[in-house]
Amino acid sequence: MEEEEKKPSKAKEIWSYIGGSIMIFMFFVGIYLMTYYHSVDVEAYLSDRGQVKVEKFDYGIFYDGPGESEAMIFYPGARVATNAYAPLMQEFAENGIDCFLIDMPFHMAFIGKHFAGNVQEDYDYDTWYFGGHSLGGAMIADYAASHIEDVDGLLLLAAYPTKDLSDTDISAVTIYGSEDGILNMNKVVEGRDLLPEKSVEICIEGGNHARFGSYGEQKGDGQATISGEEQRRQTVEAFLKYK
């Protein structure tokens, strides 16, 4: 008489299903993280230009301009190429604020949220600003909240804080475009109560979400009515005025 074929236990079936589901999930997460917005027309801003020297360092790209006392550490937006912010960093450096543009693992600022501290360990400036775009802005504001003694001011581009900074004496400049289709304005309004007393909020008329960087159009964003160059110019001008 033939022996009955043994059937896999219910528990093994469940664990096999779970394992397969996890592998599929991780596959799509990997695809998501590896798919990002590439920079557009930034080559001229990746090498020395005028008074600004550009060089790579351990955590990204350093823009060393004519200024000597002020510097900004800048976190890019989620899934955006680091060098898409090269034109903006160049303009800040030309105006006396050296910039450290941080290269995030998988283009996600929450993974390298602590990198600002690493930069500050290696460089010495009298005044430090923390800046970022979108998720990068939220993450560097988060880092600032727990390292408030290391920062003098914040620049939040299409971003808002998630931790309380209201009792601090740092400055904060929030800037977004009137045509931004990505930014959650309800969160911006809620975030106002978390910002320090020395805060200003500026809306760039005609600007959108993507044109703080140079990476083309972003899915879901509004249609800008000003150029990226003009949006960056107004951004730098506003920060220099209110920092």
Task: For the regions a language model picked out, list residue spans one by one.
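Hydrophobic membrane-insertion alpha-helices, especially the h-region
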Residues: 15-33
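Short beta-strand element of the alpha/beta-hydrolase
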Residues: 69-77
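Conserved alpha/beta-hydrolase
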Residues: 89-110
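Conserved alpha/beta-hydrolase fold motif
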Residues: 130-131, 154
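Gly/Ala-rich beta-loop-alpha elbow adjacent to hydrolase catalytic centers
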Residues: 131-140
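A conserved short beta-strand
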Residues: 149-161
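Short beta-strand/loop motif that positions the catalytic acidic residue
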Residues: 168, 174-176
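Active-site-adjacent alpha-helix of alpha/beta-hydrolase-fold enzymes
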Residues: 176-230
